[in-house]
């Protein structure tokens, strides 16, 4: 299971959002300590009623995400607006011996399936280590590594961007890895920063009161009946 740790966030995030929102009203606030928490929370709640979410972009959260498959991080880094990434590089980090760890999907269940899966991983590891021993550079030998090898990545999202990610990745349509990671991010923010921010990280249907996956290509969800 992946591990998510919130390591840094914007100082006085509630007050920053309130002050930047007041800017739009012509009210300049330079002393963040003068802002009452209840006023800032009310401002954040009001921002949920409008499409003007700019003030939410002033608040950043930085996480360390450990033990996730590279297949997942390939998806993570597609989000570029309001996001920064710093990932373990296979050009420099050799995945030999105990460093060669990989993910096993939930549908790989039977003894025969697991046997085939582990054998494939064993062969990939052996080929990788043989290439390194033969003098092939790490950045070239990595080509034989499986896409589900575990990696670590540092990520920073602004609040508005993270809210958009949560809408999609907390949904039942999303793969379990994503749901786990965003759930942990939500818990970290709730416990370390303020519960109001955790409340903002919800599924699309919970925010918009309609399903965002109704095409013939989407899987069915138990919650869809609520919006039909």
Question: Which residue stretches match the model-derived regions?
Answer:
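Family-specific signature for flavin-dependent thymidylate synthase
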Residues: 1-228
